[in-house]
Swiss-Prot record:
Membrane association type: Multi-pass membrane protein
A cellular-component GO term for this protein: endoplasmic reticulum membrane
Key word Zinc-finger present: no
Pfam family for this entry, one: Tmp39
Key words of the record: Endoplasmic reticulum, Glycoprotein, Membrane, Transmembrane, Transmembrane helix
Residue ranges of coiled coil: none
Name of the molecule in the record: Transmembrane protein 39B
Residues of this chain annotated as glycosylated in UniProt: 9
Stretch forming the signal peptide: none
Major place of residence: endoplasmic reticulum
Family statement: Belongs to the TMEM39 family.
Gene: tmem39b
Protein function: May protect the cells against DNA damage caused by exposure to the cold-warming stress and facilitates tissue damage repair during the recovery phase.
Amino acid sequence: MAGGRRGPNRTSYCRTPLCEPGSAGGAVHGGIPSVSGVRSRARSSSSTGLSSPPLATQTVVPLRHCKIPDLPADRHLLFELQLFFCHLIALFVHYINIYKTVWWYPPSHPPSHTSLNFHLIDFNVLTLTTIVLARRLIGAIVREASQGGKSSVPHSLLLVATRFAVLTGTGWSLCRSIILLFRTHSFFNLLFLCYPFGMYIPFLQLGWDFRRPGLSHMPNTRDLASMDRGSKDYLHVLQHILRHHMPSAEPLPTHACCLSPDLIRSEVHYLKLDFNWRVREVLLSSMLSAYYVAFVPVWFVKSTQYYDKRWSCELFLQVSLSTSVILTQHLLPARYCDLLHKAAAHLGCWQKVDPALCSNMLQHSWMEECMWPQGVLVKHNKNVYKAVGHYNVAIPSDVSHFRFHFFFSNPLRVLNILTTLEGVLIFYQLYSLLSSEKWHHTISLALILFSNYYAFFKLLRDRIVLGKAYFYTAVPDCERKLN
């Protein structure tokens, strides 16, 4: 024939779906759902970089999750006390920077018998700032004293007295400071104290969605039904602002290790919202603490008082960064990051490919009821995607699923970021300490460094232990026997 030569009859490939809809809908982790065979044409160009699925039957094998050791963690009340102590150190060194004296001068110069000009300090501002910095500690004490349980009558009376004393003392000190500040300062100056809260209200009102899915298998879903879009008001927004700045002692979510695509996507959606909630709590708490440590004291300084503005800005950055690292380490512990990693492993990921490079390869129509093995090509929204994960139930066009898998596919990613940030902060503080020439800068950096060493030690300890645990799990059994 003029058009080409004749050859033997070619085998026709049946383009059947990869899996039957609903085949993995009710499977549990112990079962192995079978998936129909996947065949591709033999003509695969080596220049495309795409490998077609094997000719044998594809089978979804259950994942083997790593069992991480139980790392010691601080109690919630002890952690809040440690965080408050770090904030007090930062506030103390900032007051040294503002109200320092020249007490070492000889009597011929204007001497001072103290290292600080205490008569220039506004103790009402100091009291208000201390209460704001202690808000999480106060909430933790009240929560510990409010926990019910079978206890003796004297113990119950002691808890009630403790709760009453803490709330009464805090409320009286706060009201007294605010009243005295209204007498000595203008209303415009007092608005500076409420500036962070004024920014949160429109930000929360317009930008955040507090709705959460009602998942029955999640034991500790926060009740956010009152924050529906149709019923948002400023009272509810203020309530959730306070929740962001109060300590969160809720238990960690649990991992529903199942092979149902719908349940896996629902679990990932819930964990994504829970993770965003924890990150928002970290950001809001750290920014508010740094604001009251670095900016509020200098705003109420008299016009004749000199202070180092550059040091105040550096202190704001250092306090916000160190507080963010400490809070993130507490709210995102190793067990929680391992939970997110397991969910990301079940979710999988898709990589968008050029349709021209895989036109001669078998392509399936993506179905949400199916669980797709690694290396399969699917069509979704007129695009072609390749399965990247061990098995994949993510929506190919959903960017949030891609980000979730990218960020949590490595279980040590969050811990590596925190360790790097804390290490860079400590290195910068050590460099500033060695190059400082002023006595108050030396004292300030030395005290702040001591408050960061403990957090860095815990991060390094967790990183070393978890790194060895995940590495031991990743090594095949045959290599372990050889070693």
